Swiss-Prot record:
Region called Disordered, residue ranges: 602-640
Protein name: Chaperone protein DnaK
Gene from which the chain derives: dnaK
Higher taxonomy: Bacteria, Pseudomonadati, Pseudomonadota, Gammaproteobacteria, Alteromonadales
Organism of provenance: Psychromonas ingrahamii (strain DSM 17664 / CCUG 51855 / 37)
Function description: Acts as a chaperone.
Protein family according to the UniProt entry: Belongs to the heat shock protein 70 family.
Length: 640
């Protein structure tokens, strides 16, 4: 079996890792960075991913997509999506099936399709490093992701050409990265994960027996719509309000200006983790009849903390719930691990330290731990690593809607997965021959207050008085946290099954189409890369040849020069086209036409070298200046 890579598909940044020599290694991307911005931009005929996409975001805000993870597996009408619609520079639209999709260059796209672009870059980064094709991956998701969001992430992997071997929770992956090589023995750790768009807390027990470590997740909690992007937005809103007060201008109607403010806010937030204050200076942010307007605002760390303090404090309640669900107290926690870039904020560290009564460990890289843990899980699945066992949990309860519109739970939250559990239900009316099984995920008592995952009908039930038929409903959750449900009439043995998939909003046909499109685009991308490479080689030979023509001077016969110029002209025309073979052929033609030229240049170089040994030493520049000065009379009046 080939290498199974680990991918942290983040809201703001993504990261890829692989096990090398028994140790998880972060792989640098083509730009030489260890993390890649989860940003995708669509320009005329080209898709940019990562840093290149981020660099052009100011001039192309409507077609530059970021924080797509906040939309993955969500419905358009969701409260969180409606909030994002108001603040995102790109267009969020309602798909035919009611899901939240995005629109760029007039094309409507599903979030898994866009996330697949980031995953493709991660896949290529790993392939370039390993020198072999990669097909298997472990992808991480926030622990509090529901079934729809997990399935959508899995679909994104498929579209990217990856076989997703396992979906693993981010805090669990971070615990792997911390605990696999730790010599501490048995311990209970709290993983506080505040990333770009999501927040999770997981309580994890690490047991070691005869050198084999078991990682058991005791409980998990969180908020799938809270993270660094929200912190950025608080600062953006403050800056826009301040500018309006100072200049009387509302920047919210100017997408280009807002993108500049967003970039500056993100940068300022990062700077304020190490500095007490910073200046946000954006010249020419807008203009009116009186001239250009500049944004120049000083931000202190205290001001930023006052803007976001309520959000940081809101993460403490999930900590209390997670401890309660694990039946533990703060005193039972041996170590605290911080994961996610937003945990670099001093206020976050301060509140977490106060809550747990101990400082978080500093030996875990918050940006890289999750990908490294995913790579370790990949090595476990491939058989490369055998001394580790992971016991993860389902983050939310699962059940069905029963009489009166109530959620009746079949699998409780924080149940170790994989798991299979059954309950027996009956009919609500006399002579009822069919029942609808409505599957729900959540913690609320009222069925409609929970996430609907799907429904199916069980027909052919033997007619009898209400409460007599026995219908066994079985919930089977796999290791990825994806659900399979079956219902059987115990009397007639009539059975119906459903796998809760397509919760991502994509049918099997749509996913297949996107997979095929991605493969076709991969071929187009490869051709584009080859054409660019051929153009670069052509530019290089044109530059060299022009330089050699100058060096040869009159020594180059006129007919030879004409021949070379004609070849250069043909090459210039070829580089304007998209045919790699023609560009390469014309490049070769220039090289062949320049053979005589190269001989002349070489002869001149050799002659100069030989002559240099016999000729007296050349005057230095200083000597030249002295001699020239003898012929120059500079009058005092002429001096300026």
């Amino acid at each position: 079996m080939g290498k199974i890579i680990g991918i942290d598909l983040g809201t703001t940044n993504s990261c890829v890792s692989v096990l090398v020599g028994g140790v998880a290694k972060i792989i640098e991307n083509a730009e030489g960075e260890r993390t890649t911005p989860s940003i995708i931009a669509y320009t005329e005929g080209e898709t940019l991913v990562g840093q290149p996409a981020k660099r052009q975001s100011v001039t192309n805000p409507q077609n530059t997509l970021f924080a797509i993870k906040r939309l993955i597996g969500r419905r358009y009408e969701d409260e969180e999506v409606q909030r994002d619609i108001k603040i995102m520079p790109y267009k969020i639209v309602k798909a035919d099936n009611g899901d939240a999709w995005v629109e760029a260059h007039g094309n409507k796209m599903a979030p898994p399709q866009i996330s697949a672009e980031v995953l493709k870059k991660m896949k290529k980064t790993a392939e370039d490093y390993l020198g072999e094709k990669v097909t298997g991956a472990v992808i991480t998701v926030p622990a509090y992701f529901n079934d729809a969001q997990r399935q959508a992430t899995k679909d994104a992997g498929r579209i990217a050409g990856l076989e997703v071997k396992r979906i693993i929770n981010e805090p669990t992956a971070a615990a792997f990265a911390y605990g696999v090589d730790s010599s501490k023995g048995d311990s209970v750790i709290a993983v506080y994960d505040l990333g770009g768009g999501t927040f999770d807390i997981s309580i994890i027990e690490i047991d070691e027996v005869d050198g084999e470590k078991t990682f058991e997740v005791l409980s998990t909690n969180g908020d799938t719509h809270l993270g660094g992007e929200d912190f950025d937005n608080r600062l953006i809103n403050f800056l826009v309000a301040e500018f309006k007060t100072q200049q009387g201008f509302d920047l919210t109607n100017d997408p280009l200006a807002m993108q500049r403010v967003k970039e500056a806010a993100e940068k300022a937030k990062i700077e304020l983790s190490s500095a007490q204050q910073t200046d946000i200076n954006l010249p020419y942010i807008t203009a009116d009849q009186s001239g250009p307007k500049h944004l120049n605002i000083k931000i202190t760390r205290a001001k930023l903390e006052s803007l976001v303090e309520d959000m940081v404090k809101s993460t403490l309640e999930p900590l209390r719930i997670a401890l309660k669900d694990a039946d533990l107290s703060v005193a039972d926690i041996d170590d605290v691990i911080l994961v996610g870039g937003q945990t670099r904020m001093p206020l976050v560290q301060k509140l977490v330290t106060e809550f747990f009564g101990k400082e978080a460990r500093k030996d875990v890289n918050p940006d890289e731990a999750v990908a490294m843990g995913a790579a370790i899980q990949g090595a476990v699945l491939s058989g490369e690593k055998t001394d580790v066992l992971l016991l993860d949990v389902t983050p939310l309860s699962l059940g069905i809607e029963t009489m009166g519109g109530v959620l009746t739970k079949v699998i409780d939250k924080n149940t170790t997965i994989p798991t299979k559990q059954s309950q027996t239900f009956s009919t609500a009316e006399d002579n009822q021959s069919a029942v609808t099984i409505h599957i729900l995920q959540g913690e609320r008592k009222r069925a409609t207050d929970n996430k609907s995952l799907g429904q199916f009908n069980l027909e052919g039930i033997r007619k009898a008085s209400r409460g007599t038929p026995q219908i066994e409903v079985t919930f089977d959750m796999d290791a990825d946290g994806i659900l399979h449900v079956s219902a059987q009439d115990k009397d007639t043995k009539q059975e119906q099954k459903i796998t809760i998939k397509s919760s991502s909003g994509l049918s099997e046909e749509e996913v297949e189409k996107m997979v095929n499109d991605a493969e076709a685009n991969a071929e187009a991308d490869k051709k584009f890369e080859e054409v660019v490479k051929a153009r670069n080689q052509a530019d290089a030979i044109v530059h060299t040849t022009r330089k050699q023509i100058e060096e040869a001077g009159d020594a180059l016969p006129a007919d030879e020069k004409e021949k070379i110029e004609a070849a250069l002209k043909e090459l210039d025309e070829a580089t304007k086209g998209e045919d790699k073979d023609i560009i390469e052929a014309k490049t070769t033609a220039v090289a062949e036409a320049s053979e005589k030229l190269m001989e002349i240049v070489q002869q001149k170089a050799q002659a100069a070298e030989a002559g240099g040994e016999e000729q007296p030493k050349e005057k230095t520049k200083e000597e030249d200046d002295i001699v020239d000065a003898e012929f120059e009379e500079v009058k005092k009046d002429d001096k300026k």
